[in-house]
Amino acid sequence: DPELSRGLGDVYKRQVAGAIEGRFLGLPSIAMSLASWECKHFDTAGNIAKLLVAQIDKSPLAYNTIINVNVPDIPMTEINGIKSTRLGNRHKSEPSIQDLNDPSLYWIGENGKEADNGEGTDFHAVTNNFVSVTPLQIDLTKYPEIKQVSDWLEKINY
């Protein structure tokens, strides 16, 4: 998919959603993106996909794991390798944009700028011509906050 899927916004991108659905069906799943808006090197992404599928066939991932893959949009010969990464982080999105033809409609603003793009992140890997492979889990529960939310809910007089 030519939609960029790097950073914490990944969890609601269509390719990640598709991979989650595949995992719910019991299938090993990969969310794959060519990290560019121009998308010139689909052959590179295809070659990387073949390598990853062959590896999954030999050594399957844990049931509750999907991998989010971002491939730099460059020739295969320029790829520096494949790295296991974590999701980077972005600043908040740009403000919404009012539709010029229908002022009652608004468009979601552009993605925020990279906030955490340091070594080990998907952003850093792709910027340095590495394929980024980020393991994702389906359970989004923020376990350390369960007690705090429980205490917060006690303040509701219901």
Task: Place the predicted regions along the sequence by residue.
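Short glycine-/acidic-enriched loop or helix-start segments at secondary-structure transitions
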Residues: 9, 41, 143
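Charged helix-capping and loop-helix junction motifs
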Residues: 12-17, 48
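Electrostatically charged, flexible surface regions
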Residues: 44-158
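Short, contiguous, pocket-lining structural segments
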Residues: 14, 41, 125
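Buried hydrophobic packing segments
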Residues: 18-19, 52
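Single conserved hydrophobic/aromatic residue that forms the stacking wall/gate
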Residues: 1-8, 12
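Glycine-rich phosphate/pyrophosphate-binding loops
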Residues: 19-45
